[in-house]
Amino acid sequence: MTVYKVPQKEFAFILDEIVGYEEHCKMPGFEDASRDVIDAILPEAAKFFEDVVAPTNYLADSQGTQLIDGVVQTAAAFDGVYQQMIDGGWCCLNGSTEYGGAGLPGVIDVASQEMLQSSNSALSLLPMLSRGVIHALNLYGSDEQKNTYLENIITGVWSGTMNLTEPQAGTDLSAVQTKATPDGDHFLISGQKIYITWGDHELAKNVIHLVLARISGAPEGNNGISLFLVPKYLPNTDGSIGRANDVRAVGIEHKLGIHASPTCTMAFGDNGGAIGYLVGPENRGLMCMFSMMNNARLAVGHQGIGLGERAYQQAAAFAADRVQGRVAGMPQGAPIIHHPDVKRMLMQMRALTEGGRALSFYAVGAEDRSHHHSDAQQRERGALWVEMLTPLVKGWCSEVSMEVASLGVQVHGGMGFVEETGAAQHMRDARIFPIYEGTNGIQSLDFIGRKCLRDGGEGLSLLLLEMDTTILTLTSKSPAIVRLRTTLERSVTDCRAAMAQVLANPDDAPAVAYSYLMLFGNALCFWLLVVLAAAAQRRIDEGATDRFYSQKIATASFFGSQILSRNQGLLQAVYDGSASLDLIDAGDLVSA
C-alpha cells in the first residue's frame, strides 16, 4: 500500500481549462470564491484527506461494521475522523451560506469529494447521501423543514439517507409497500427498507431518512408514492435532539466491498409508527426523490474516478519499485514499470481516470451555471447539459472504474490477488458503482431514451456542436495536436452516425443502449482530454518546461489510440441493433 497524494495540479489545470474558473467564480453567489481563495482552500483539504482520512482505508475495510444489540458500530479506524471532517467544514463545501454552508461552487466541492473518495470510498458515502438530502430539501422542503434540518445536515452534524428499496421494489419502485398513515400534522410510517447506505451509525448525532411510502388510499403504481422525512431522533422546538423515533436498523449486509459503510435493513414503525413529515406534494414522491437520485448518480461517477486515482497511484508506485525481468537497453533487473505491457496498463488506468475526471468537472460546471449564471439562456443550457451528462458520468465513470481497479490488480501480479497489498480492496469496492443509485443498464436506457429519442437528438446535437467548435480551435502545427484533431473529427462523425442509426431504428434502442452510452462516454472524455492537451501545447509553446504539460498530450494521444478505438466496435453494435439478441429466447438462457 502506498501513500495517497491529492492530484492538486490536475484539479488546477481542469479548473482553468475545462471549467474556465476565472469567469466561473464571477457568477452571482460565488463572489467570495475567487481563485486566490480556492488556491488557499484546496491545499488545506488535500492535507486533511492525505494525512487523516487516507490512512483509514485499509484498516476500516478490515474492521467493517457490526450490529450489536440493535446498535450499529462503525470501524474503530473512524474514531474522531468524521468529527474532524465536521470541524474542518469538509462535509459539503457548496452548501448554502443561508444554512451554515461555505457557498462555494460545485466544481470546488467535487474536488473535495474526489479527495475523500480516493481516501476512503466507504466513508465518502456518508456525506454523499447527505448531499442528496440537502438537494431534495432545497427543492421541495417546506421553510420549517429547511430551517430545522438543513444547517445540521450541511455541516455534517446530522447525516441523511435515501430509503427507496424494498425486497419486492428495486428498480421498479411502483411496487413500494411502505405505508404512511395521516396522524395530525404528520404521518405514521410503517414498513421495511433494504440496502440503506449508512442507514444507522454513531458518527453523526442524528440520521435524517427520506423515505418513499404510500399514503392510505393513494393510487396504485408510481403515481401513488409520496416522500417523507423521518428523523432517527425527533428534534425539539429549539432544534436540539429529542426522543428517539420508531425507526431502527435490524440488519447489516455482508458485502463484497465497501465493508466500512453500514448497509442497513431499516424497520419503520415496529412499535406504533415512525413519525414522518411529507416532503413535496402528495403522490409526487418519485419526482422529489429523483432530484436526490440524480445528485447521487453524479456523485457515484465522481466516486469511481476517486477510487481509480487511488488504484492508479498504488499500481504506479508498485511498478516503479518491483524489479523483475529484463528490458532492452537497460541493465538486468529493471523495475517492471519499464516493461511495455505494464506501461500500457498504467497509461490505460491514467487515461481513463483523467478522462472521467474531466467529464465530471465539465458536468458539475454546467450544474453551477444552471443555478447561478446571470443569463437565463446560459442557465437553461447548463440544465440541459446536466440532464444529458448525468447518465454518462454515472454510467461511464463507474464502468471504467472497475476496469482501472482490475488493471491495478494485474499490475501487482500475484501480489494484487493478496488482500494485504490493498489492490484487491479497490477492485472489490469498485464493483458496486455500476449497480447502486440506478444500475448502468438503467443509465443506458435513460441516455438513449430521454436524452436522444425523446427530443430527436436535439440536445446531443448541440453538445456535438461544442465538439465541432473545439476542432476549429485546434490550429497548432504540433504533429501531436494535428493527429488529435483528426481523431476528434472522426470521433464526432461516429457519434453522429450512431445517433442517426438510433433515431432511424428506435425499436432497437434497448438492445444497443449500453453500447451507445459507452460510445458517447469515450467520445466526450476524449474531447475533453484534447481540450487539455491543446492547452498544454500552448503552455509549451510559451516556454513551459514542466513535464506535466507533455504528459497531458501523451495521455490524450494514448486515449485516442488505445481507448477511443473501441468505438468502432461499439458503433458496429449499434448498427447491428437487436439482431443477435433476437436469435435466442430468454428461456434458452437458463435451459441446458
Q: What are the language-model segments listed below?
A:
Residues 2-5, 89, 188, 258, ...:
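Alpha-helix capping/hinge segments and adjacent helical runs
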Residues 454, 470-592:
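C-terminal amphipathic alpha-helical interaction region
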Residues 1-124, 144, 148, 368, ...:
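Amphipathic, small/basic residue-rich leader segments at the start of a protein or domain
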Residues 78, 129-130, 141-178, 182-185, ...:
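Internal maturation/activation junctions in enzymes
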Residues 186, 190-244:
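A short core secondary-structure module
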Residues 29-32, 62-75, 284-299, 313-350, ...:
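Glycine-rich cofactor-pocket loops
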Residues 195-197, 234-250, 255, 262-296, ...:
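A glycine-rich, basic-preceded beta-loop-alpha segment at the flavin cofactor/substrate interface
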